[in-house]
């Protein structure tokens, strides 16, 4: 999965000089906000709704995902600025960061859904018990 050196080189060429510079400028600004926002969102959900205190340690998964996303963005900016001198190894490292980021973001999303579902079921159960008494 992911992308190859040939695909990166073709994309970089397709962007053109102006496109690469624009992308290199946008990535550190806008692409920095997104990981911070989604990591904070998932951390907040996991911290607030984790059913047991020991499960609140799950907050480190979205934090790590956000850090990996930022590292991936740095790799992309480096490739944008170094074009056409992009090594196969650099693309492989960027690809690893991309694939790892996807794993951590999907895992964070799944954990948030599970924790929210558990919290909702718990709230329904508590209300049902109150009606029974």
What are these regions (language model features)?
Residues 1-23:
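Extracytosolic (periplasmic/ER-lumenal) interhelical loops and adjacent juxtamembrane/interface segments
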Residues 1-3, 32-35, 70-75:
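Transmembrane alpha-helix/helix-exit interface in multi-pass inner-membrane proteins
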Residues 11-19, 37-50, 75-82:
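Membrane-helix exit/interface motif
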Residues 16-26, 50-57, 86-100:
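Membrane-interfacial loop-to-transmembrane-helix junctions in polytopic alpha-helical membrane proteins
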Residues 26-47, 113:
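Hydrophobic alpha-helical transmembrane segments
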Residues 47-67:
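Interfacial segments of alpha-helical transmembrane regions
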Residues 65-120:
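Alpha-helical transmembrane segments of multi-pass integral membrane proteins
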Residues 116-133:
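Cytosolic juxtamembrane helix at the C-terminal end of the final transmembrane segment
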């Amino acid at each position: 999965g992911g992308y190859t050196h040939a695909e990166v080189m073709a994309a970089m060429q397709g962007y053109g000089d102006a496109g690469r510079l624009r992308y290199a400028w946008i990535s550190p600004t806008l692409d920095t906000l997104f990981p911070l926002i989604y990591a904070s969102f998932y951390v907040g959900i996991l911290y607030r709704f984790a059913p047991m205190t020991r499960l609140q340690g799950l907050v480190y998964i979205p934090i790590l995902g956000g850090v990996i996303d930022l590292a991936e963005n740095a790799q992309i900016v480096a490739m944008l600025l170094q074009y056409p001198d992009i090594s196969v190894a650099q693309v492989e490292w960027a690809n690893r960061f991309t694939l790892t980021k996807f794993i951590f973001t999907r895992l964070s999303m799944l954990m948030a859904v599970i924790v929210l579902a558990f919290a909702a079921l718990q709230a329904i159960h508590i209300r049902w018990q109150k009606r029974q008494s």
